[in-house]
Amino acid sequence: MAKHKINVPFFEIGPKSYLYGDDVLNLALAADKASEKYGVDVIFTCPVVEIRRVAEATKHIHVFAPHMDPIPVGRGTADTLAEALVAAGAEGTQLNHVEKPLDFDTLAATIARAKEVGLMTMVCADSMAEASKITALKPTCVVAEPSELIGTGISVGPEYVAAAFECVKSVDPDVLVLTAAGISNGQDVYNTIIAGADATGSSSGGAKAADRAAMVDEMIAAVRKAWDERHN
């Protein structure tokens, strides 16, 4: 079982390989500040080599790895070991991103390995059928995002958000639903949350912004605003 918990609403920031070194840390610090300011949980999907530094420098964000392998302790040159992620300070891992896809059997084994060491799992799905199948594996969160929209600046519409939420919750109401792809600014974030998602997230929208800290603040503020409007 996972040792940690994500509260809704939440927001995911994944700098991928757009940033490295101090730029990753500074983005994480901005996310940490905004998380506390707005009372919104933030998953920071961190390059593996920066996990320890980011985890030690922040207090409010949930530091995730971008990938993990299902190997046990032992052989596995260049693989990412679950126990090593925990030791570095990670609370969870992303899996099955379109840029790092896994076949279903490997994905199931990797989710199981993550659970063994208490890591949360945020698993990407490219279709409703895949989302349904992944939900049955009981990850922490399913990320429903059409791969053709990733990095385009074109976000999903409210119909997709509602369908993804229903798809996941009909299989397991305890699995969280993050709907993303093409999230570029606070308005995109607001539109996604107000349409019914537990969460949304951004990679290039934050990492490539002219003022990254300001964009992170804008996006996380939009999560809070939309969620409060939905529930008041």
PLM regions: where:
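Catalytic cores of alpha/beta
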Residues: 80, 125-138, 182-200
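Glycine/small-residue-rich loop that forms an oxyanion/phosphate-binding "nest" at active or ligand-binding sites
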Residues: 59-114
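Glycine-rich beta-to-alpha transition loops that act as phosphate-gripper elements at the mouths
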Residues: 66-77, 104-105, 123-128, 176-187
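Conserved N-terminal beta1-alpha1 strand-loop-helix module at the mouth
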Residues: 1-80, 121, 131-138
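Glycine-rich phosphate-binding active-site loops on the catalytic face of alpha/beta enzymes
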Residues: 91-102, 141-154, 195-216
